[in-house]
Amino acid sequence: MNQTYGRLVSRAAIAATAMASALLLIKIFAWWYTGSVSILAALVDSLVDIAASLTNLLVVRYSLQPADDEHTFGHGKAESLAALAQSMFISGSALFLTSIQNLIKPTPMNDPGVGIGVTVIALICTIILVTFQRWVVRKTQSQAVRADMLHYQSDVMMNGAILIALGLSWYGWHRADALFALGIGIYILYSALRMGYEAVQSLLDRALPDAERQEIIDIVTSWPGVSGAHDLRTRQSGPTRFIQIHLEMEDNLPLVQAHFVADQVEQAILRRFPGSDVIIHQDPCSVVPREGRKFELV
């Protein structure tokens, strides 16, 4: 699984870096030629795209290294650090200052048609990239690629806003460029805060989504020989899910048979969530307090 995961995530990061680099060169020319502050916003964002995607590529390769004596649970948390770094890279503050300045004192653009052409190219390329990233996220659940995808999704909205702003400026409403740049800056800042929150939650070992935990509960409680279960604990580090659970079994069940049942339950969980780290503890029903004989999500 890790080989497929690493290959897909690396390809997503390489594709994002290559596209951002190409668009950066085009946007530099377009900004120099038109003087559009909205294109300047897109240019700054492309610089952030390159830095973020390169960081993703390096961090993902590190996170896929096998566990060692100092990192016995592996290096998957590095992905959350990459997502947190992306949230730090993204900032709309400089755009606020530039857009407010242009809002107060609008500057006519030179040939908005060039800016429109460049923005259409950027929009098409970004939509293609986001579609590929969404496919990779669906296959891998990579937090780093998901953070990168959220960033490029904001780029799609940004490029759409730039198209509208350039079109309005073409017809003489020069303040539209600054207004849309201000809106872009606000949205970029919002995206940064959202990505930072998700990364911090992962670093704090947030439990798996409710739907996945419910699937684990369904697998366990429907298994023959299991009378009940409690203390389900879950988290995720990179591509690896960590699942711990206590099974309740009849007191007179031989230890060998209890181990066999627990092993079957573990294999069933692994079939549903390949590559997971599953720890199962067997408890005799008599040692479980009556109030504890129900499923508890921890």
UniProtKB/Swiss-Prot annotation:
GO terms for cellular component: plasma membrane. Its main location: membrane. Zn(2+) binds at residues 45, 49, 151, 155. It comes from the Bacteria. The chain crosses the membrane at residues 24-44, 80-100, 112-132, 154-174, 176-196. Pfam families: Cation_efflux (PF01545), ZT_dimer (PF16916). It is a multi-pass membrane protein. GO terms for molecular function: cadmium ion transmembrane transporter activity; ferrous iron transmembrane transporter activity; metal ion binding; zinc efflux antiporter activity. Divalent metal cation transporter which exports Zn(2+), Cd(2+) and possibly Fe(2+). May be involved in zinc and iron detoxification by efflux. NCBIfam families: CDF, PRK09509.1. PANTHER family: CATION-EFFLUX PUMP FIEF, MITOCHONDRIAL METAL TRANSPORTER 1-RELATED. Homodimer. This is Cation-efflux pump FieF. It comes from Salmonella typhi.
